[in-house]
Amino acid sequence: MTDWRFYIMDKRYAVLIDADNVSEKYIKPILDEISNEGVITYKRIYGDWTRPALASWKQALLNHSITPIQQYSYTTGKNSTDSAMIIDAMDILYSHNVDGFCIVSSDGDFTRLAARLRESGMHVVGMGEKKTPNPFIAACNRFVYLENLAQGEVSDTAEQDKDKSDDEVHEVVKTKTIKNA
């Protein structure tokens, strides 16, 4: 007989990836890492797939059943991919189908999105390269550096507790266990 308690206890996550700011070499470690948090119910990646720079993503998307979201670059210098990702995140939030989000980008433009999702009670895991701006890191409940995941090393995480004051310093620490409750 199936014990349904195990299914109910798993948190459901939406994984949203900014293809403009993340390399395809990180995809397996990203999915493995967030699977430690719960069940991935949405796997979406955003970019202008007509650009040759994103062609290398094709096999990774097929192998991991990730839905590519096409967003044309309408104007030079503007990032319409970010806008599409933010709109989708809000749609998913209001669907009430997830308990948390994993935002994968090294772009500080997602700082307000992470903060807004947390205001709505969502658990937000950020993932990005070490060049990620500190405000985005601080806006997430937990942040994981992709370089360490890809190398299979102990992950650097920048963790924030919702109860901490804004005046506290958020340190990047080495940890063997990077799963948070």
Locate each region found by the language model.
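Domain-level signal for Mg2+-assisted phosphodiester chemistry and nucleotide/NA-binding surfaces
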Residues: T2-D88, L93-Y94, A115, H123
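Conserved acidic residues
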Residues: Y13, D99, N141
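Conserved nucleotide-binding/hydrolysis micro-motifs of P-loop NTPases
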Residues: N21-S23, W49-P52, G108-F110, K131-T132, ...
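Acidic beta-strand-to-loop metal/phosphate-binding motif
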Residues: Y46, D99-S106, L113, L117, ...
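Short, surface-exposed amphipathic charged segments that create phosphate/polyanion-binding patches used
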Residues: A84-D88, A139, A158-K164
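A polyampholytic, Gly/Pro-enriched intrinsically disordered region
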Residues: D91-N97, L146-V154, D161
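Intrinsically disordered, low-complexity glycine/proline-rich and charged
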Residues: A115-D156
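N-terminal regulatory modules in eukaryotic regulatory proteins
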Residues: E159-A181
